[in-house]
């Protein structure tokens, strides 16, 4: 259960929102529920008598969601005064962005529907009968869900990359340490070989000197 319509709008699916609205969860006075249901029945009768505004009727002229010709009464219909005007079919009587009460044109022509309803109940009643607004609302929710899923997937990818990069750093450090140790060993081996060579040269030199001394002594003794 949500404390206000804004929280429900951002966190609740479309059908669950409309279900909670129809049950009067957002009403300050629960006794208004029966009055709202009565208003909804009256609204149904009005729409049945006037199929132009009954979007479930086959006689209504539905506006495609792919076209950018659907507007909001509260923002764009101040100049429309005739319900029979062809322009009126291109407007939806609820502004979900600001959640304000319907425009006076709605109150004027449909007083039994909107005069006693809260703005939440009026929106719910309209969504129940208007395939266009329900489709738009569903499209908005789907876009929000898709955007959130993209953010979650991107976040997971970033975390995977971040977890993978330290392992590469550790591997690079271990390889560097191994190379350094091998270089040190090679240097030690080379230095040891040089020492042996030097010692061998010295020994050979001493032996040669001794042989020369012996030869010289023998020569002198003769």
UniProtKB/Swiss-Prot annotation:
Task: Name the source's superkingdom.
Answer: Viruses
Where does the UniProt annotation locate this protein? Membrane
Any GO CC annotation of this UniProt entry: membrane
Q: Does the keyword Membrane apply?
A: yes
Q: How does it sit in the membrane?
A: Single-pass membrane protein
Sites of glycosylation?
4, 75, 84, 104, 170, 175
For this protein, the parts annotated as crossing the membrane are 200-220
Q: Mainly localized where?
A: membrane
Sorted UniProt keywords = Glycoprotein, Membrane, Transmembrane, Transmembrane helix
Record has Transmembrane as a keyword: yes
Q: What is this protein called?
A: Uncharacterized protein L448
Lineage of the species this protein comes from: Viruses, Varidnaviria, Bamfordvirae, Nucleocytoviricota, Megaviricetes
């Amino acid at each position: 259960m949500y404390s206000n319509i804004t929280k429900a709008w951002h966190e609740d699916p479309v059908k669950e929102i409309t279900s909670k609205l129809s049950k009067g969860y957002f009403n300050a006075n629960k006794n208004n529920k029966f009055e709202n249901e009565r208003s909804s029945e009256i609204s149904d009768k009005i729409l049945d008598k006037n199929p132009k505004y009954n979007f479930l009727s086959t006689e209504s002229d539905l506006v495609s969601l792919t076209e950018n010709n659907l507007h909001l009464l509260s923002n764009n219909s101040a100049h429309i005064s005739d319900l029979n005007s062809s322009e009126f079919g291109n407007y939806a009587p609820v502004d979900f962005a600001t959640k304000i009460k319907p425009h006076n044109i709605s109150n004027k022509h449909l007083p039994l529907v909107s005069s006693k309803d809260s703005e939440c109940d009026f929106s719910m009643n309209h969504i129940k009968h208007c395939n266009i607004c329900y489709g738009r609302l569903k499209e908005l929710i789907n876009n929000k869900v898709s955007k959130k899923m993209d953010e979650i997937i991107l976040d997971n990818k970033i975390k995977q990359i971040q977890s993978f990069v330290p392992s590469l750093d550790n591997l690079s450090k271990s390889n560097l340490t191994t190379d350094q140790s091998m270089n040190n060993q090679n240097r030690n081996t080379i230095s040891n070989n040089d020492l042996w060579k030097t010692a061998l040269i010295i020994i050979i030199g001493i032996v040669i000197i001794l042989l020369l001394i012996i030869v010289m002594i023998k020569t002198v003794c003769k």
